[in-house]
Curated annotation (Swiss-Prot):
Brain and gastrointestinal tract. The gene is cck-b. Residues 1-20 form the signal peptide. This is Cholecystokinin B. It comes from Xenopus laevis. The lineage of its organism: Eukaryota, Metazoa, Chordata, Craniata, Vertebrata. One of its GO terms (biological process) is digestion. Belongs to the gastrin/cholecystokinin family. PANTHER family: CHOLECYSTOKININ.
Length: 128
């Protein structure tokens, strides 16, 4: 539950920051707005344009490092969620029972749910 709340807060923060970024982008038509945009771009090197290929590669490495950090965090989260399965938390890969593959209705995705027409098809043998 705590992880769900954290994810919701993270998404709310990201959407708020993107809305704020769009609002500051609309000021770019007048001279004051463009000066503010240039000031912001000079302070954030990630958004600055690279004049040579060497600088461009260094920015790509930073993005790659961030992606690997996010990937590592995701792997750790998935491992923790798998370990915490019996405690009542959501299990990422549930243990599903194995069914007979030769049965004529072999795709049983809806365990415990009545899929329309399937139950009646299992109960009655059709002669045709």
């Amino acid at each position: 539950m705590c992880s769900g709340v954290c994810i919701c807060l993270l998404l709310a923060m990201l959407s708020a920051s993107s809305k704020a970024h769009q609002a500051t982008g609309s000021l770019g038509e007048d001279a004051v707005g463009t000066e503010m945009d240039q000031l912001n771009l000079s302070q954030l090197p990630r958004y600055a344009r690279a004049s040579s290929a060497g600088q461009k590669k260094s920015f790509q490495r930073t993005d790659g490092d961030q992606r690997s950090n996010i990937g590592n965090a995701l792997v750790k989260y998935l491992q923790q969620s798998r370990k915490a399965g019996p405690s009542g938390r959501y299990v990422v890969l549930p243990n599903r029972p194995i069914f007979d593959q030769s049965h004529r209705i072999n795709d049983r995705d809806y365990m415990g749910w009545m899929d329309f027409g399937r139950r009646s098809a299992e109960e009655y043998e059709y002669s045709s």
